[in-house]
């Protein structure tokens, strides 16, 4: 076993969830410790802040989609992408079946929840590609709280992790949940 280095900090891109399984399995099996790494895994208060927190040197590493790294570099942060956790993020549009949303085109006239600085841009770009005017729906910044926002009727649909928020919402509402993978 190697000598442990000082603590290394890793800021997740979200609350801990199945997406992060490889990180926690490696910690549980002692793989970091075997490499001399004393890893502190942290969750963000707001996933939008991760690249800035890493860029300011407040943590050693952070998880974010590549688009956020590019944007942070454009803002002057000296960040480097060193790997990927999954080939494709498990994100998509999530809504209760009772909302009537079955396809991306069904967002017209609806309130669409998004996360972070790029969420609205992503929704609008996808809408334009689908031939939908961005003025035909309302966007609402909801942060990490998609299930809560849907349950409190703040949004009809939103971008979220299909591997756990879809399950969480179905559990909270006892209702079938629609999802459309965005990749």
Question: Where would I find each of the regions flagged by the language model?
Answer:
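Phosphate/pyrophosphate-binding betaalpha-module
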Residues: 167
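Short, glycine-/small- and polar/acidic-enriched structural segments
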Residues: 2-152, 156-161, 179-181
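Extracytoplasmic/periplasmic substrate-binding proteins
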Residues: 170-183
